[in-house]
């Protein structure tokens, strides 16, 4: 199964053709920052934007080496977002900890996701419930959720990888997609929905169309966005109706039982700990009764899938390829298997939250894969919303109101000055405290200068040294105040998947690792690859 579906390809091609026909001949807006990717030619911005569909990540690396390593921001053309200012690593922490009144993330994400076109109900798509569920509820309940998720993932492996002792080939992307989706929905809605193949497939398809459709809408001229947006909305509506058909009975029953429990506290029913219940409880707590209906709750459930499935599935797939394509002589597999088998035995053959915390080498192997194979070449998009802009004169940083910024994630991750032998997969890299400290020092060091936003300096800003943690040793989960709220659950699920594989399966070394394809800022597994596996005799 390819990440780019036929529909996604059609939508992207349509946006490009319409852009060629209707984009005006534009030139870049004046800026103090150097530009990378433009040529001296007619319709330079349009033509640069079109080339960015396959050259953006190359330009990001070019600009990083030429400018960012000297702490100079630079500007890239982008088909889906227009000019983007790329921020050097040493300036990132200062910028990304600015208050939301200076640097916006919510409206930027809504623009990236094209919420106004792809969501039939704007309120749940634009409020903070997704982040509240991920950050507050799931993270808070990880200790109780981990054994349940582990059990479901083990069942998924039995189903998709099998229990045969003979070697067999499996499609990496397809199996990762199914296993990850089932594991996520164990937390979101529980059984039986987390095992409903039609429900899970519709969630997968919806998340794919959402990503591809949003990119196509962003790339189209404003005048024509309603056409592409209408097409994407129509397909998303069909897929949503499919998921709702499978989930509405569960949601309806939950609404009825919750109402009965609220009316009569002695009612004999214990609410499940899952996202459906957290959504219902949150709507009651906020007195948001207009959203307390089956359709809206089903839609909120789908949105949680949309933000979870694609990136986690991608990360699991690249983890398996990076690990099993590494030279066996390096001893990664032996060390990882010994660690997982030891912890699994000590925990009585049950994966618990405390057991997973002991998997230090396993966590390092996962983080190293996230470093080596980021979801995008650039990321962490934000928009300057301070009317006076943001400036750092000593470093020629001048960001007017409305400027879109991003970070050169892949370029930083492949910088040998930060990560020695950066092109190599080293499963032990993040298990070495001294190596992690050195990475933190490189990424968190700040220039001795103040950022000006036309007002008082942000008093909540703290020194990098006092607030640094391992999540800032690399940028897979972001940086600053809006770091990924679901990162703890992602690490739990990825640890479980890798540990279950190492304990229960043999995997032949991967001789050919498919290269990720650049599609704008995304890294796309066009050819997902295969693994040859068999169930271990233990």
Swiss-Prot record:
Protein's job: Nonribosomal peptide synthetase; part of the gene cluster that mediates the biosynthesis of okaramine B, a prenylated indole alkaloid that possesses an unusual octacyclic ring system, including a four-membered azetidine ring and an eight-membered azocine ring, and that exhibits insecticidal activity against silkworm larvae. Within the pathway, okaG acts as a 2,3-diol synthase that installs 2,3-diol on the okaramine scaffold to convert 12-deshydroxyl okaramine E into 3-desmethyl okaramine B.
Pfam families from the UniProt entry: p450 (PF00067)
Taxonomic source organism: Penicillium ochrochloron
Cell location: Membrane
GO cellular component, one term: membrane
Designated name of the protein: Cytochrome P450 monooxygenase okaG
Topology of this chain in the membrane: Single-pass membrane protein
Cofactor(s) named in the record: heme
Disruption phenotype: Abolishes the production of okaramine B and leads to the accumulation of okaramine E and 12-deshydroxy okaramine E.
Gene Ontology MF annotations: heme binding; iron ion binding; monooxygenase activity; oxidoreductase activity, acting on paired donors, with incorporation or reduction of molecular oxygen
Family: Belongs to the cytochrome P450 family.
One BP term from GO: mycotoxin biosynthetic process
EC number of this enzyme: 1.14.14.-
Pathway membership, UniProt: Alkaloid biosynthesis
UniProt gene name: okaG
Residues annotated as binding heme: 484
Catalytic activity line of the entry: 12-deshydroxyl okaramine E + 2 reduced [NADPH--hemoprotein reductase] + 2 O2 = 3-desmethyl okaramine B + 2 oxidized [NADPH--hemoprotein reductase] + 2 H2O + 2 H(+)
């Amino acid at each position: 199964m390819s990440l780019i579906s036929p529909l996604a390809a059609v939508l992207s091609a349509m946006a490009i053709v319409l852009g060629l026909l209707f984009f005006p001949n534009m030139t870049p807006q004046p800026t103090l920052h150097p530009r990378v990717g433009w040529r001296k030619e007619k319709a330079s911005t349009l033509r640069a934007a079109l080339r960015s569909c396959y050259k953006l990540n190359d330009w990001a690396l070019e600009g990083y080496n030429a400018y960012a390593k000297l702490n100079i921001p630079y500007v890239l053309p982008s088909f889906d977002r227009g000019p983007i200012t790329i921020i050097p690593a040493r300036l990132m922490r200062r910028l990304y900890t600015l208050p939301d009144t200076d640097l916006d993330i919510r409206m930027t994400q809504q623009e990236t996701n094209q919420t106004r076109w792809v969501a039939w109900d704007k309120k749940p798509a634009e409020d903070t419930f997704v982040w509240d569920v991920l950050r507050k509820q799931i993270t808070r309940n990880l200790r109780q959720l981990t054994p349940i998720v582990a059990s479901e993932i083990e069942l998924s492996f039995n189903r998709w990888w099998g229990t045969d002792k003979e070697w067999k080939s499996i499609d990496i992307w397809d199996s990762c997609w199914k296993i990850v989706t089932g594991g996520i929905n164990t937390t979101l809605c529980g059984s039986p929905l987390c095992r409903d193949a039609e429900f899970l497939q519709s969630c997968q398809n919806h998340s794919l169309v959402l990503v591809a459709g949003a990119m196509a809408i962003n790339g189209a001229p404003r005048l024509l966005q309603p056409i592409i947006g209408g097409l994407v909305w129509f397909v998303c509506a069909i897929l949503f109706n499919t998921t709702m058909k499978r989930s509405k009975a569960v949601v309806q029953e939950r609404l009825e039982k919750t109402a009965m429990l609220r009316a009569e506290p002695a009612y004999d029913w214990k609410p499940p700990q899952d996202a459906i219940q957290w959504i219902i409880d949150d709507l009651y707590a906020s007195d948001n009764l207009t959203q307390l209906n089956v359709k809206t709750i089903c839609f909120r459930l789908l949105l949680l899938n949309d933000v979870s499935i694609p990136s986690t599935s991608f990360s699991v797939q690249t983890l398996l390829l990076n690990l099993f394509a590494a030279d066996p002589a390096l001893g990664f597999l032996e060390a990882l298997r010994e660690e997982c088998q030891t912890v699994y035995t000590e925990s009585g053959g049950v994966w618990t939250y405390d057991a997973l915390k002991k998997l230090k080498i396993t966590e390092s192997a996962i983080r190293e894969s996230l470093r080596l194979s980021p979801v995008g070449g650039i990321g962490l998009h934000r928009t300057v919303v301070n009317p006076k802009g943001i400036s750092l004169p000593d470093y020629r940083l001048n960001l007017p109101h409305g400027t879109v910024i991003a970070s050169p994630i892949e370029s930083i991750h492949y910088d040998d000055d930060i990560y020695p032998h950066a092109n190599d997969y080293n499963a032990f890299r993040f298990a070495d405290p001294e190596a992690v400290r050195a990475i933190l020092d490189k990424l968190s060091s700040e220039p001795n200068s103040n950022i000006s936003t036309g007002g008082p300096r942000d008093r909540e800003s703290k020194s990098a040294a006092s607030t640094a943690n391992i999540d800032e040793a690399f940028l897979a989960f972001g940086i600053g105040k809006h770091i990924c709220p679901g990162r703890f659950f992602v690490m739990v699920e990825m640890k479980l998947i890798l540990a279950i594989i190492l304990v229960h399966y043999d995997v032949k070394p991967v001789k050919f690792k498919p290269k990720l394809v650049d599609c704008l800022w995304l890294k796309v597994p066009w050819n997902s690859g295969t693994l040859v596996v068999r169930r271990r005799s233990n």
